[in-house]
Amino acid sequence: MCRCPPEHHDGRMTSAEVGAAAGGAQAAGPPEWPPGSPQALRQPGRARVAMAALVWLLAGASMSSLNKWIFTVHGFGRPLLLSALHMLVAALACHRGARRPMPGGTRCRVLLLSLTFGTSMACGNVGLRAVPLDLAQLVTTTTPLFTLALSALLLGRRHHPLQLAAMGPLCLGAACSLAGEFRTPPTGCGFLLAATCLRGLKSVQQSALLQEERLDAVTLLYATSLPSFCLLAGAALVLEAGVAPPPTAGDSRLWACILLSCLLSVLYNLASFSLLALTSALTVHVLGNLTVVGNLILSRLLFGSRLSALSYVGIALTLSGMFLYHNCEFVASWAARRGLWRRDQPSKGL
């Protein structure tokens, strides 16, 4: 559990607590906030966070693999249309459960989020169609860095200096873990880089709406899905007309994969929104980087895949970055006892 003082946190629960909740129940210690205070009321149940994190990770991994299967095996050359279908199914799925009344200022923020949401999905699927799945994961490992910078610039969030320092080994380590396995030159990374930047911005916007405007996940997904669908459907009509032959009505396997991809997208987005409401934008993407390392380790254990030396270096860097991010105050206290850290001047520390 992170030992940072409350003012250094950018959210309400870190992914270290998510891992603790998923691993098993622990005895609750004394509350950090007085009972009845706003901070105490915002503390989420660990079981809810663990469940949202598990669903988010599984749905995200399954959706990425299935989308890549649709693009490569079935030859579906319309990534913008697929993104539009994702948003259409999300609007239909959330129609009954969404709250309709919304203040005018909130609607404007939701429309801006819809623009970011739709553009990031489009860039991500266009890039995924052109590059290997591992390379797509490599590019997205820089998302925590973009999210941290955007949360500080747009929301004024304060971060512990050691949390800032942890971004280096965290992002570099995950990138090295995947880069060590590449045997082909990277192509088409421009769309993935754009999607990564927009994904960080989208998470910051979502976190603000969920935590400050008190919107629930279903309402926010419904409110953003309709404008995003209009944007993506229009882009698909203009940019993908005549690019590839449309799928035939009798291609049942392709349509089944597309429907499953849409349902996974709804599940992924709902879990992502719930996790953002319970934790923070940065914590979500830090947790996502840990899964990159986990995928490589599982590949080694289950399938006997051989990892390069660079991959092992990347795993070590990522784990060290995770430890530093979630134990920044503990590291600062240890360094202060040895004269390496001055608490009154944190910017001159490690």
Curated annotation (Swiss-Prot):
SUPFAM superfamilies: Multidrug resistance efflux transporter EmrE. Coiled coil: none annotated. It comes from Homo sapiens (Human). Residues 125-179 form the EamA domain. Keywords: Membrane, Transmembrane, Transmembrane helix. Belongs to the TPT transporter family. SLC35E subfamily. Residues 19-42 are annotated as: Disordered. It is found in: Membrane. This is Solute carrier family 35 member E4. It is a multi-pass membrane protein.
